[in-house]
Structures are given as structure tokens and as C-alpha cells.
């Protein structure tokens, strides 16, 4: 990779020659169209045209992955050979500059609608470090989040406000008090609870932060709360200001619905940690021949300056296989910048409890992560405090190389969790 270009890798499917399709992709997303036009000089093409770096054939399939009217009009149907290939393209940085929405439009955009393909997926996005540094950085990232909550080592244990919706502002604050007393490091709103009529942020933020301040005064422990401020941009900025005025340290947004520009504006407006909830990512990712892989996805959002990004959880309740969850977390833990630590905190959630800790540790060999459990804490038979302790005991066990069953011999909270949740698993 050169300092003048960024590179993107794709998985494509087509009945045409993959090499020819790769050239169409490069032209469509730079200075070309379906035919050469006046003004498209050789000099302009040399400066502005994207370059195909590699086409790797992957074999054929019997039928197209996606419908395509353009290919049907060309006569491609039964009997066609649908070829798959990996394509790598280099794009001139000068075409885009430090413009995040245009970067996203360049590496994806109209490529998904190309007539020449029956499948296209953006898999990877690689940026020269100097180019990455033209974009926003996380405010806290991994190390800053640890400092904020006072967790020098070990996984950061979090939970989610449940019931998701329906609690009043005061009821939410009362639940937060219970969760703080249980010993969590982090509490977040659910993605469907932002500014509801029964618990508007103007009431919920002060009520919850009063509890957080009282807990710190009583115990010395600071608990980070991610208030869901998802909304149109100006409202998000107002809500973030209120969180900051009340002494809070984090806000959450449903990034796919707020958009890259909205999150950039939020990042540049507030020093608070941005907890990026990826709900809706499945629409971009679940079909293997369409959408966007997590490496490219998290790269774009990290350029918007988020601090934490959801990756789902191992052995969890959602559709992603464990291998994808692990790869997603590893992507978050890799630096994009050579000059600064721009790693973001992978947020594990969905069906997590003490019993999913060994697989998480085995896959990552790291506890630089946010391990969030709802039922795994709140439904522990001995109460939420025992639920939190069981998760911390599980992390202590894997760090010292012990099995959970062995460690549970002197950790009754873990033993009860294994007995209770294990029967359900």
C-alpha cells in the first residue's frame, strides 16, 4: 500500500470475466463511466482512476446469489457459469480527502448496484496510517475507558437496563442503584430506549447521574453509564451536553441510523466516550455475497471517532457464528494509526454469562473488552451481585489457567451460575 492510495478488497460473483468486472468497478468508483467521455484525458485517468491490484479466482457456483435484471437482459440465466473472485482495488486519496461519507460512498456505494455482478461484498478497507490520522480518534478508547471506571486489569463487566422500555426515570434510577451496588463497571440503555415519553432524557439523565455520584461518594467506585441519545443530530448534541453537565462519561448511539456524519458531529462536539451500538448491521452482513464485512465496517466507524463497538457474543443468542464474533473483536483491537493508540473497546453482549468467558478468553487471550450480561447477572439465583461476582470469578479462573468447575470449588457464586445457567444452555 502506498501513501497516496487506500485499498479495498471485495468478494464478487459474476458470469463475466472477473478481470473485466474488476476494471468496471475501478472505473465506476473513480473517473470512469460506461464509456469514455470528453475531458477524461489520459492525464486525468493517470491521476484519478482507481487501479485494480489483484483478481483471485475462487471457482464457480451453479446459480446466482442475487437477482439481476441487467444480466437477464444480456441473456445470462440457466447454464451460465457464475464465477466468484476476490478483487483488490486501490483508490487515490486525492479523490476523497478527509471526507468520511465520501470515503464510504467510494468503497461501497453504487458497486452494490452494478449490473455486471450477481453478488458483491466489501470485505476489507486498508488505509495508510497518515491518511487515517486525518480523521477523528476515540476520546477514551481502551485505556481511557479503563481509567474512567478504575479497572486497571481484567475484563470490564457491564449490563443493560431491563426491562428495555416502560420504566419511569425514577424507576430507571432505582434499578441503576441496584446494579451499582451489584458491582458492575458499566451500564447501558437498550437500543430501543432513547427518549421515551415515560422516561425522557431530561428527567432520566439527572435521576441516574444522582445515583452514580452518590455511589462514588459512598464507595469510591465510578460506574460508566451509556445513555442512549440516538436522535437527529442537534438533539444528540443537546443530550450529550446534559450528560456532561451532570458529570457523566459516556453516551450511546445506534450508529447505523444516526449515520457517519451524525456520529462525526457528535464526536467533535463532546469529550464523552461514544458507545457505538451496531443494531441493524445484520442487514449489511448476513448474506455472504452482499454488504460489508466487519473489518471494513468498524474501520469506517472508527474514523468517526467512536470508543466502543458492539461485536455480539460467543455462544450467544444472535445469528453470527463464533468465528465471526472473534474476528470482529480482533479487528477492534488492531491499531489503524501508527502514531496513536486508536484501538476501540469491543463490546460483547447477547446471551453472555460466566459460562461463556472461557471461549472468549481462549479466542482472544485478552481481557481488553467490555463483557456485558443481562440475564447472566440479573437472573443469577443469588441476585445481581452474585451474578457480577460469578463473571469476575470466571475471568480470574481463565487468567490463571483453571477450569470453571475447578475454580467454582472455592467460588460459590460461580458454582451457582454453572448449576443454574448451565442447565439452560
Give the residues covered by each predicted segment.
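N-terminal capping/small domains of soluble enzymes
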Residues: 1-181
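Active-site mouth loops of central-metabolism enzymes
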Residues: 11-16, 155-173, 223-235, 280-292, ...
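Alpha-helix-loop-beta-strand connector modules within alpha/beta enzyme cores
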Residues: 29-30, 44-48, 53-60, 199-227, ...
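Flexible, glycine/charged-enriched surface loops at secondary-structure junctions
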Residues: 37-39, 186-191, 195, 215-223, ...
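Active-site-adjacent beta->alpha loops and helix N-cap segments on the catalytic face
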Residues: 138-149, 193-215, 233-236, 255-271, ...
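Phosphate-binding glycine-rich loops and their immediate beta-loop-alpha structural context
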Residues: 159, 166-193, 199-200, 212, ...
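Catalytic alpha/beta core domains of metabolic enzymes, predominantly
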Residues: 238-241, 246-373
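Extended, intrinsically disordered, low-complexity segments
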Residues: 299, 383-425
Amino acid at each position: 500500500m502506498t501513501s497516496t492510495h487506500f485499498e479495498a478488497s471485495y468478494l464478487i460473483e459474476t458470469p463475466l470475466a472477473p478481470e473485466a468486472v474488476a476494471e468496471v468497478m475501478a472505473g465506476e468508483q473513480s473517473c470512469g463511466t460506461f464509456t469514455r467521455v470528453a475531458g477524461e484525458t489520459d492525464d486525468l485517468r493517470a491521476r484519478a482512476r482507481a487501479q485494480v491490484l489483484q483478481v483471485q479466482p475462487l471457482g464457480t457456483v451453479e446459480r446466482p446469489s442475487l437477482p439481476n435484471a441487467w444480466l437477464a437482459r444480456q441473456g445470462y440465466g440457466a447454464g451460465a457459469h457464475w464465477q466468484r473472485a476476490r478483487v483488490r482495488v486501490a483508490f487515490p486519496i486525492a479523490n476523497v480527502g478527509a471526507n468520511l461519507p465520501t470515503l464510504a460512498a467510494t468503497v461501497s456505494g453504487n458497486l452494490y448496484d452494478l449490473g455486471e455482478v450477481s453478488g458483491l461484498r466489501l470485505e476489507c478497507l486498508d488505509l495508510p496510517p497518515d491518511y487515517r490520522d486525518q480523521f477523528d480518534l476515540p476520546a477514551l478508547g481502551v485505556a481511557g475507558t479503563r481509567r474512567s471506571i478504575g479497572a486497571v486489569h481484567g475484563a470490564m463487566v457491564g449490563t443493560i437496563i431491563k426491562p428495555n422500555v416502560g420504566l419511569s426515570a425514577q424507576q430507571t434510577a432505582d434499578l441503576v442503584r441496584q446494579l451499582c451496588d451489584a458491582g458492575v463497571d458499566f451500564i447501558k440503555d437498550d437500543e430501543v430506549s432513547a427518549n421515551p415519553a415515560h422516561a425522557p432524557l431530561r428527567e432520566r439523565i439527572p435521576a441516574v447521574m444522582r445515583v452514580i455520584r452518590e455511589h462514588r461518594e459512598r464507595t469510591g467506585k465510578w460506574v460508566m453509564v451509556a445513555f442512549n441519545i440516538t436522535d437527529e443530530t442537534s438533539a444528540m448534541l443537546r443530550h450529550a451536553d446534559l450528560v456532561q453537565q451532570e458529570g457523566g462519561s459516556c453516551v450511546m448511539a445506534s450508529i447505523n441510523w444516526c449515520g457517519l456524519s451524525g456520529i462525526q458531529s457528535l464526536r467533535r462536539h463532546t469529550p464523552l466516550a461514544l458507545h457505538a451500538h451496531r443494531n441493524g448491521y445484520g442487514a449489511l452482513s448476513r448474506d455472504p455475497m452482499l454488504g460489508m464485512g466487519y473489518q471494513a465496517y468498524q474501520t469506517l466507524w472508527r474514523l468517526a471517532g467512536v470508543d466502543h463497538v458492539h461485536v455480539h457474543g460467543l455462544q450467544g443468542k444472535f445469528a453470527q457464528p463464533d468465528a465471526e464474533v472473534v474476528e470482529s473483536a480482533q479487528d477492534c483491537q488492531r491499531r489503524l494509526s501508527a502514531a496513536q493508540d486508536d484501538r476501540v473497546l469491543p463490546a460483547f453482549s447477547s446471551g453472555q454469562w460466566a459460562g461463556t468467558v472461557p471461549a472468549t478468553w481462549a479466542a482472544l487471550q485478552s481481557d481488553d473488552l467490555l463483557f456485558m450480561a443481562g440475564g447472566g447477572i440479573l437472573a443469577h439465583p443469588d441476585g445481581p451481585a452474585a451474578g457480577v461476582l460469578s463473571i469476575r470469578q470466571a475471568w480470574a479462573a481463565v487468567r490463571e489457567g483453571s477450569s470453571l468447575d475447578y475454580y467454582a470449588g472455592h467460588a460459590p457464586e460461580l458454582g451457582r451460575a454453572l448449576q443454574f445457567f448451565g442447565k439452560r444452555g
